């Protein structure tokens, strides 16, 4: 079961919500997220023919800011250097005190946060994918406004968070939108013709993240975009590529891509590429040592890995090893709910993880700039 995050009314991303909390207090943000979780618990109980009073434990994961706001903790420590979470261990709490109307002795279970922008949701991914128990080295990437990554195996794990920006979630893109009905989700240039699909087979209304990456990749591979990201002339309007004209769209503007949109994609993919490179450097390994690449989250499930590799988001050598894993954070929360020993083990794993602070890395800027160009 899912709902749109009600906190979006206070800010489009976690940074804006954190700023709102610092200026106006956490009460509004805390109240609305607790209420929606409690409402969904009631809906799930009704669908199962049970009472919420039968629920004895609830496991919750989320990014560090969401984690703090759910608990009613100020996110002040997350927006000021050194960007450390206020709490970094797993918690077992009284659920009723946090607005969840379950069994009167019901427990709220929270996996630990790792760093300021690597949260309990990343712990859930590690737990679901068993990265900390594998002999082979794997890379997990959860692409969103912050691109969280974990690289390693049972011997050593390193993680980081890159400010990928909201482009892949449809923000800051002229015709961008979330992955809803009418969003162009896949694009192919074939035999001189543009083909695309939309979510729900509705009239095209905009570009969601997967469609955006496909479109940029296809434009680059077909020679409409050069290595620097410059959109070649030839369109009716300079610096604009029209995929769907207004008369064929579900709106009066059509679906198109601007030069600025391409720049936003370059910024996002360069941040992810730089994060991967610096994690490999920290562990002193190369692409050939990475045996699996897990793409977590809803976006990773729908993104075409070939398009991501084509624009340089991932090293091309990793393409055959890429595996979408869907809602790994949610699966990790389920495992944590059912296994106390796994929760304890995750606390130990987090304490031993190597967090790479990209903002403090003298090499990050060079890697980032190198990653702006298309390969």
Question: What are these model-derived regions, one by one?
Answer:
Residues 1-71, 77-79, 109:
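N-terminal glycine/serine-rich phosphate-binding loop of ATP-dependent small-molecule kinases
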Residues 63-77, 285-288, 297-316, 358-367:
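Short glycine/threonine-rich loop-to-helix capping motif typified by GTGT followed
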Residues 50-63, 216, 288-297:
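Short glycine-rich phosphate-binding loop at a beta-alpha junction
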Residues 36-48, 122-125, 129, 266-288:
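Phosphate/ATP-binding catalytic cores across multiple sugar-kinase/actin-like superfamilies
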Residues 153-155, 285-349:
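Catalytic phosphate/nucleotide-handling subdomain of diverse soluble enzymes
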Residues 220-283:
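A contiguous, well-structured pocket-lining segment that forms one wall/lid of small-molecule binding clefts
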Residues 107-122, 335-375:
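Acidic, glycine/GT-rich loop-and beta-edge segments that sit at the periphery of enzyme/chaperone cores
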Residues 1-13, 76-90, 124-211, 304-326:
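Glycine-rich phosphate-binding loop of actin/hexokinase-like ATP-binding domains
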